[in-house]
Amino acid sequence: MNKTAIALLALLASSASLAATPWQKITQPVPGSAQSIGSFSNGCIVGADTLPIQSEHYQVMRTDQRRYFGHPDLVMFIQRLSSQVSNLGMGTVLIGDMGMPAGGRFNGGHASHQTGLDVDIFLQLPKTRWTSAQLLRPQALDLVSRDGKHVVSTLWKPEIFSLIKLAAQDKDVTRIFVNPAIKQQLCLDAGTDRDWLRKVRPWFQHRAHMHVRLRCPADSLECEDQPLPPPGDGCGAELQSWFAPPKPGTTKPEKKTPSPLPPSCQALLDEHVI
């Protein structure tokens, strides 16, 4: 499937999530041992943790949206990464969307983030902590040129390279989605230490943030992991294909009906949503 068709499918998936979703009616985590259920784009979570809003190492954006819930492994990853960044004097980590209290489908903006194992992190590390007003209405820093072929050299910083590398080297991380131009710059800057690049995957948009995804926890027996990324650093023909013009004759795919929820997620909705 060519990139244009993939883009249209991604847009349709995101558009489908614009419809009202019952998951928003669940305002607190569902009690129980932490269990990520289903797939990243069709699932839910029991026993989610709340990311502490107050931290000396990170700040949480758009707290009014209440998207700061996730599996305990995700909360620990954020705390681990932000502590590393702070210890290196790189700045404050800016945390975007995680998931809703019980996971599930958003009403817009995301097709995934449903099992408590995804988090968006801004690709900027302010040295001065943001004000409450800045956090509620964050200004994203677009690192990619208008033509989408490279990063903006005046905005690309070694600290951003290090932030992505630190996240990719974490044992629990399986994928990090960034814009193809950002992946390309990482490939140029990486030197001989390149194993971590395998986890960094080019994807549409993602011009100002990285989307980090963790592996399914071992004790979440109903969690569906993705296959591992292809071997290698992903800096060759696959990456370059993202910069090729779309093939003529690309047709818009038919709108897909959302897949049925995993039975455990449907049961959760039936119990907790009137």
From Swiss-Prot:
Name of the top EC class for this enzyme: hydrolase
- For the keyword Zinc, the answer is yes
State the superkingdom.
Bacteria
Identify the EC number(s): 3.4.24.-
Cofactor comment: Binds 2 Zn(2+) ions per subunit. Zn(2+) ion 1 is bound in the active site. Zn(2+) ion 2 is bound at the dimer interface by residues from both subunits.
Keywords, sorted A to Z? Disulfide bond, Hydrolase, Metal-binding, Metalloprotease, Periplasm, Protease, Signal, Zinc
Signal peptide segment:
1-19
Identify the residues that bind Zn(2+) 2.
Answer: D147, H150
Q: Does the keyword Nucleotidyltransferase apply?
A: no
GO biological process annotations for this chain's record? peptidoglycan metabolic process; proteolysis
For this protein, the record's InterPro entries field holds: Hedgehog_sig/DD-Pept_Zn-bd_sf, Peptidase_M74
Task: Please list where the region (Disordered) is annotated.
Answer: 228-264
Cystine connections = C44-C265, C187-C235, C216-C223
Residue intervals passing through the bilayer? none
User: From the Swiss-Prot or TrEMBL record, what is one GO molecular function term?
Assistant: metal ion binding
Q: GO CC annotations?
A: outer membrane-bounded periplasmic space
Positions annotated to bind Zn(2+) 1: H110, H113, D120, H211
Q: Which cofactor does it need?
A: Zn(2+)
Q: Where in the cell is it found?
A: Periplasm
Q: Which NCBIfam families match?
A: PRK09429.1
Which function does this protein serve?
Murein endopeptidase that cleaves the D-alanyl-meso-2,6-diamino-pimelyl amide bond that connects peptidoglycan strands. Likely plays a role in the removal of murein from the sacculus.
Q: How does it assemble?
A: Dimer.
UniProt family annotation? Belongs to the peptidase M74 family.
Protein name, entry field? Penicillin-insensitive murein endopeptidase
Give the species this sequence originates from: Escherichia coli (strain 55989 / EAEC)
What broad taxonomic lineage does this protein's source fall under?
Answer: Bacteria, Pseudomonadati, Pseudomonadota, Gammaproteobacteria, Enterobacterales
